[in-house]
Amino acid sequence: MSGKAHGGKGKSGAKDSGSLRSQSSSARAGLQFPVGRIKRYLKRHATGRTRVGSKAAIYLTAVLEYLTAEVLELAGNAAKDLKVKRITPRHLQLAIRGDDELDSLIRATIASGGVLPHINKALLLKVEKKGSKK
């Protein structure tokens, strides 16, 4: 009997079995954030006997990763405008409050974020133009 008559992979059935490594669900989805951890969190905090699908965890992870990248990009631009290399809570505050959609989404108070600079127009001094009369 030859080795091919039996079922299974055997020695010649698998081509380089070392290259078949298991991939994480984050790697399969092409994400940096941990899909498994998000799924575990969803399952733990689901109400009652709610079932959580794997695609729900992947979708939520992708949304969280996108929002984080968006906020970090805007905060990085704010830090670059101020000519510093480190993003601080102040830069996060300026980035979030400067974007209308992020401002409506994130209504939280950012610690050490400060406030946005704003002066009411009624408080500004009126400057008269000289030489306008003829």
From Swiss-Prot:
Modification comment: Acetylated by ESA1, a component of the NuA4 histone acetyltransferase (HAT) complex, and/or by GCN5, a component of the SAGA complex, to form H2A.ZK3Ac, H2A.ZK8Ac, H2A.ZK10Ac and H2A.ZK14Ac once deposited into chromatin. Acetylation is required for function at telomeres. H2A.ZK14Ac is acetylated at the promoters of active genes.
Annotated keywords: Acetylation, Activator, Chromatin regulator, Chromosome, DNA-binding, Nucleosome core, Nucleus, Transcription, Transcription regulation
Primary role: Variant histone H2A which can replace H2A in some nucleosomes. Nucleosomes wrap and compact DNA into chromatin, limiting DNA accessibility to the cellular machineries which require DNA as a template. Histones thereby play a central role in transcription regulation, DNA repair, DNA replication and chromosomal stability. DNA accessibility is regulated via a complex set of post-translational modifications of histones, also called histone code, and nucleosome remodeling.
Name of this protein: Histone H2A.Z
Positions where N-acetylserine occurs in the chain: S2
Annotated segments matching region Interaction with VPS72: 98-108
Keyword Transcription attached: yes
Signal peptide: none
In-chain residues carrying the UniProt-annotated modification N6-acetyllysine: K4, K9, K11, K15
